[in-house]
Amino acid sequence: MYSSYSLSKCLVSFHILAIQLFIPSVASLNLTNVYLHHKCRVGQGKYHPGSRYEKDFDSLTSFVAANKFIDGFVHSSNSDGPNSTTIIFQCRGDSYKSNCRTCYDTALAGFRKRCPRNKGGIIWYDQCFLDVSMINDLAPRKINYKDTFAMHNPNNVRGDTKMFSKKTNDFLQQLIVKADKPDMDGVELLYYAAGEMRIGREKLHAMVQCAKDLADCKSCLEWSFKELSKCCDGKRGARFLGTSCNLRYELYPFLRT
């Protein structure tokens, strides 16, 4: 029997603040799903081939795969016993249904390859992340400040970097406010916002997003925004990622329209 909304809050710390990534082609970014980073939860141990844990884990991954990914988010657990496993999977806000399903397949294969037989771990791709853990917690989830990292374009903007940073930061703050507003039905918070704006001759593209089961989206995004500012002001593109929320800006389009 599978249940939703239970996740680990026992996470090992890692924090990477200046991983540089330069993507030269807009087309390749839009059409591919680039691997970004991963972390194996070695403290949760490994499972043996043919074990009960492996069977339960395979059953859970198949259960998640059967999801239609309508809103691009899944949070599911298989039990509360010693073989308990929780999967949290979320796609970028512009990736859902078939695009999201493809990213799930890619992320699961990547997790199995990079964390072979690990009972827990996290893997991030350009359009989604997959979080696997043995330790469960009930939703709404608290902010995970530990499993985060930043990436930025190695190049700085030309001209007035202070003006660029101010306008970029102001725009990101506007998106954060928008993401924390109710949807059209007034039932749930959006937890996602994207947009573009002109800065001189350049056009800025940006997005912010929270996990659907997060207790406090705005606080997570505001904290991530501050962390991004520490490493990446004046860069031509940057992002800050985690399992609770993420934000990104570029000087080229990177979202589906």
From Swiss-Prot:
Signal peptide residue numbers: 1-28
PROSITE patterns: GNK2
A Pfam family per the record: Stress-antifung
Compartment list: Secreted
Keywords: Repeat, Secreted, Signal
GO CC annotations on file: extracellular region
Residue ranges occupied by any Gnk2-homologous domain in the UniProt entry: 35-137, 145-254
InterPro entries, A to Z: CRR_secretory_protein (IPR050581), GNK2 (IPR002902), GNK2_sf (IPR038408)
Domain of life per record: Eukaryota
PANTHER family to which the protein is assigned, alphabetical: CYSTEINE-RICH REPEAT SECRETORY PROTEIN 34-RELATED, CYSTEINE-RICH REPEAT SECRETORY PROTEIN 38-RELATED
Protein family according to the UniProt entry: Belongs to the cysteine-rich repeat secretory protein family.
Name of protein: Cysteine-rich repeat secretory protein 34
Protein species of origin: Arabidopsis thaliana
